[in-house]
Structures are given as C-alpha cells and as structure tokens.
Amino acid sequence: LAAVSVDCSEYPKPACTMEYRPLCGSDNKTYGNKCNFCNAVVESNGTLTLNHFGKC
C-alpha cells in the first residue's frame, strides 16, 4: 500500500477557498480541501496525516 501525501509546505494560509475536493485525515475527519487539511496539519505540529483522498 503506497503512502499518500500532500505537500503542505506553503501553509498555513489565512483563508481557504470553498472548493470541495475532500481529503480524509488520520483523525477520521473529512476536510473540504487541501487548504483546510494543510492548515490542520500545521496546527497539529505534523501529527495529522492523510489517510486517503475523498470523504472518510
């Protein structure tokens, strides 16, 4: 099983678009898009990871 990852090096960003491209985090929460997910990754100090693309 290949690990899926997202490059969050440009984050955090102060505002995210409303674009809906869901990602499922390691906390089993569905994030609406990469921006929302990456902001959460930064807030978690890198403990949050990507489970898979799409809804959880």
Curated annotation (Swiss-Prot):
Its main location: secreted. The keyword Lyase does not apply. One of its GO terms (cellular component) is extracellular space. The keyword Manganese does not apply. Residues 6-56 form the Kazal-like domain. GO terms for molecular function: serine-type endopeptidase inhibitor activity. Disulfide bonds join C8-C38, C16-C35, C24-C56. The record marks M18, E19 as: Reactive bond 3. Keywords: Disulfide bond, Glycoprotein, Protease inhibitor, Repeat, Secreted, Serine protease inhibitor. It comes from the Eukaryota. It is found in: Secreted. Glycans are attached at N45. Avian ovomucoid consists of three homologous, tandem Kazal family inhibitory domains. This is Ovomucoid. It comes from Chrysolophus pictus. The lineage of its organism: Eukaryota, Metazoa, Chordata, Craniata, Vertebrata.
